[in-house]
């Protein structure tokens, strides 16, 4: 047995060999198994040596067989240690390929057809070499058919006629003949004759001409569908006057869209009907239901409105025979793009005439013998009169006659042909029997309708056939010659019903021939490009199957179609009833219209697809739409597309298997180039289809096509896209339609569909929405429409979202009608909701099953919306799939229910550790990670790369310490560190600098005096001596109290920040009392504040409460506060109002020395340095709100020394105190630092400053204030008020006397210029985006990022690190989120990765003096090396002395062993093992950076980067995520989201969300967006999404909690657990991490 380990092996392989040897020795492996696996490892190493840049697999080869590689780059301008290189042989492979770094996971392109036409590429594909002889066989373009100069117009020179000339002819020869009839929804008929039509049009033209408009000016035609006669008059009036018409109406466009059309076209004239004008006058706002006066709108004020209903006729036109100019542009129709954008289709005269001529030829070619009572041509001459009245055809139009196909083939085609058009309201078709009776009544010859309209008519008829008959009369359809049905795809079921169950049953002669689906391009003005014709001239069209030449139907293989191949089957056609599952029935539109060139193209490459392959249909002709109004770039792309011959010839030359085949393909391409030159312009139709026997078959629009990975079902009924799993014996991987060699070819023929690696293979398939819709609607009776689209995630994922319209879902109005306040009815409503939810669950489960059975697809989620709420395509009843997607992304879908299915996502794409039962900080993974980082670091050493024996070691993450043993007063050079307490320093200041200013109240005196309720004493410029007298006054009050206090008694000082507050603190310290400073209670949350106060009083056994006059007045004079205060008054000890104490000049502190020693002196043996004197209570964060910090005189002095020495505080720079005056750094700025440094301290009450900030801001501007401590919220408030004041001062400067004003009294934009150090505290990661937004919002105020200093503080240390005076802007690091999950710090270049594929952080600065920070693994207690993150440990003199835990339920103090241990932690390493550290519980890392300061000097800094707290990180499948990153992603999803909290509870990843106040938050849609973004950006699946009401926490809890969710995570989660939060809605998404672990372990076990 060979147990040797070759030394040349990489470290990871050496480790794996060791594991193998140990497994064999432990008898976990047989001899044969050991030898086999050893050989595999060594062979793999040899292969990797030949390909040195191939990454190795995961260390756990049984669990992870996927390739994994990262590219990294520096993201910031700073120079950092070069620790980021490719991990080529890294043994630390925690994550599977599902978590590939952002650099290697390109996003899916926005084009919906990307990678969908794989089989059109020549022979490409066969990466595995199974199809060696694939040859590129491009389809031959269909050329125009020359139909000859057939006289189609009975002697008219149609090719040169204009519509106004034709109208004039009809007026002259058919003046009394009815031109058109309009039937509204109520059945009222309105008609007009040719003479009235012409004369009224002339009247409109006259009105336009006299308005001094220019030729081709844009005229808005504002008419509804029922105003078809008035609309036709206005349109023809525009034609006659040479103007360009632009149809608009509220039935088609919103007001915003109409305003946009007016601006784009620069229209100044509107022709409008009376009905539409009344709509304008009675327009109401949808938000506040107030009347909107559009006439006063700036846009409409410049427009002239002319009502055409009352204009009358222009009789002068009878006398003259005018000559008409043929306008180039007839009208501009604004259609909507798939994404909802307006695009103006320019409809030109020659396009319209060609459409009419072509339709005339086609209808004439289809003339049948039973048409003999009609004339030979459908077009009637206009230059002479035909007496026979029955020769006219009756055209019954149910399409919108004011636009698109209804306008072209209805109104204008009727004018061109001289027949009778009857325009009916579309609502008539929805009534049973309505359409049939009108057809029979008017004996309609030609029906013009929409496929979905006709479908509803037939369904109504089949449900109740008697509705189409009456007792006196039988419906007879023998009059129908053609049924022209506008559509883009043919629903074969509808065709079957229309022909055989409607037309034929009701007497239509030759129904299959009459029914003619017409391929119309609604997005391009409604022109038609194909319909079944009998024009012949098909000699140049290719024949694929002569047996199917006369057939209009095809049966094609469904599985081949998924790979874009078209395989027809005659057998399936014969046995159509039994071949439904395997073959798809398609119906053709017919041949292209005669004058166009048509080809099928791969839109990705602009190359011809292989013959009988699906692609985008392109057409070329001089008589089709060729312009969008003022959209040049779009025009270039859409209308001037060219075939990429160079690419095709390149394939022929280089990609063919043999020279003979290459030559054959080249010759074929030469032929195509001759018949279709390279400079031919094509129009992209956005239709996906193919050509067979010269006929067009359309499968869908490009927007209705989506891609899916082929899935196989596992034995446990989960799904995977890994087709290699089929080799394990699972035969469901091969669909029925493909077996054996045929299946292999089907899979391998695509280059882009097959994705193969050493352990993975995927095949991408194309699916078409129409087929999905047909299946679901046919099998689920409550579903009526379906939309489906892919999420814009990484390109290989293809996550599908499906939206269904169902009758189970209620609209918003129906839901509101069901609301009630009656208890019984509410219970009943709740029961009904539960039943509805059960039905919804059953519905979505049924859809999931059906989609798998028939299409082998599994959507990621299904949303259920009410019926008729999804947007429809322009001028169609079909769903606008892309618009649905856009509404989904904008959270505008009224989703009532959503259900997810994630099994294949978990198995195929969810990032997870190979060791998903281990923490990334475990001893095992930490060891592997350090070995990997060490190997990387060693490989970048030049000596190592050159073969030298260098073995450099990675540095440990330690800040180093700058220890200051002493601190000296800047003036007297006295050692401040020799004093034992702050009181001794105070006395020294009083004796040496008694007349210098010590403290000052910053409150505006005027503001104080104006308020009768505030009796606080305001002390301005108090000297040291005067301050001592104030302290002495308070000492007298305490000493002489009738209820005496004794040494160590706890007392509470509760007041605003003021001079008297500081004096009271000092007085109590003199008395050796335990001082508990607390902020004043707030009226808004008085109940919670008083509860907290009573809890502290009872826990500490507080003997006295000292308050100022302002708080005393609030408690006693405010009715609301006093009512609440009386409930707790009995629990509160004596309250002393120290503001009432009078200051006497005769008093000094020294006078009380003996009294204090007698009454408050310590007992013998008491260690003063170990006795707490101050308790800091900080309730800002609920996690630590009940943990109170205790400080001794010694610890207070040490903290003051650190602040002074770090900030280099001097006596000549005044201090401003405004924030957090009762604890931490705020307490030190208020009470200690002024005394310690000798600087004057100005104390401001935050509430007063926010009321009137002028004095505070003027002080900052004019005084030499260098350092300022502000909370982020306070900074925002100050900037907001400063901005308002500066704007006010600017307005005042306009006054003439402003020059005389004192500039020191006015606020300038550089108000913060002198403040070099604005300290913003953060307990974890700095909120950099908030600060950036604040600075951007108030950019008028001069404030740079270098002035703002992040302070990293902890509950037990107010100053662990800071950025003060570094003289460099914050250092940006862009971290790879995929590496961060694994515990590794790896930078990326933000320019190289898409937004969201990095985590941006900034440093928290360097450590202060006398502080040592190390980064330690919290599980192993070993120091972390450079390149990984760990827990931040701090050894500092500023650490808290001790703590108390104040239990709110038991009202007592106690110590927690875990927290106690936290104060005296030691590392297990040999380095620094003698030091005791404070464990912060925060994760971060230290990085050495080189950067250039403002003086141009290069400085090296050990910067601390804080990532987040351990309790705010979560582990999912072995990977670590920071909830702050997840929550930021959720908040960025939609502006509706106000607050968000993510936590892990009971194995579930839970997200609590509070939406901003909005009329109708759409929570089902929002949930899906949240789940999608978390999955996309972080690779996590949310399990439960809960929406709380705006006032979501019950009255028993603080409403303020909801305002600051991030600071009150524990309280909110506890309230949720206790069901005290009112839930708006709750969505279950997945089943938790345990299910994912089960699926993964079961899957990997079977794949071993």
UniProtKB/Swiss-Prot annotation:
Region (Fatty acyl-AMP ligase-like domain 2): 950-1648
UniProt GO MF annotations: ligase activity
GO cellular component: cellular bud neck; cytosol; mitochondrial membrane; vacuolar membrane; vacuole-mitochondrion membrane contact site
Spans traversing the lipid bilayer: 228-248, 1061-1081, 1224-1244
Region called Fatty acyl-AMP ligase-like domain 1, residue ranges: 158-893
SUPFAM superfamilies: Acetyl-CoA synthetase-like
InterPro entries named in the record: AMP-bd_C, AMP-bd_C_sf, AMP-dep_synth/lig_dom, ANL_N_sf, Dip2-like_dom, DMAP1-bd, Mug62_dom
Disulphides: none
Mode of membrane association: Multi-pass membrane protein
Other remarks on this protein: Present with 41 molecules/cell in log phase SD medium.
Protein name: Homeostatic regulator of DAG
Natural source organism: Saccharomyces cerevisiae (strain ATCC 204508 / S288c) (Baker's yeast)
